């Protein structure tokens, strides 16, 4: 009976390690039924799978109950993003379910109506930003804080727990249509594009 409910509603696991945290959320239908986040500057690679397992166990579910995965693709910490993207690709392959990449910008923008600018902290006191307007999102940029247009509302990146839930919600909405494999979002000063690197090594 539980499996029938899961299949009808969809069970989506969203997770993110794009900054100094390891965060995950479990979405059943439209409800977040479990979530957890640990602040950590390093060690996400060793910590992530255990966190995901504990989250599923605590909610009374197993890996085979999942219908989709949502993974944060950044921007942010290079190593952290590759850890979660690699995990999502490996899990999607082994479970036979889609893995959907969601940027921190998209996740943060989920509950807001434009125009507004979302931002993620970047090195050297800079910010990764993306403008959302009625015409749609513009290309992400790397800017200094003084370059942000103060005439437009500015929304900092969501806190880790909220971010993981937003990633799961967006992944659930996209799960019914073909999606590209998740890839890290790297942003340079005048350029923004998903990584074209070879796929990271899949985690067992």
Feature names for model-found ranges:
Residues 1-32, 41-46, 100-204:
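Oxyanion-binding and handling regions
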Residues 40-57:
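N-terminal phosphate-binding loop and adjacent alpha-helix
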Residues 52, 88, 105:
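Generic structural marker for isolated residues within well-ordered, non-membrane alpha-helices
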Residues 52-68:
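Phosphate/pyrophosphate-binding loops at sites that engage ATP/ADP/AMP, CoA/4′-phosphopantetheine
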Residues 54, 89, 93, 173:
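Short, well-ordered alpha-helices that flank and scaffold nucleotide-derived cofactor binding pockets
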Residues 59-64, 92-102:
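Phosphate-handling active-site elements
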Residues 68-98:
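DPxDG-like acidic metal-binding loop motif
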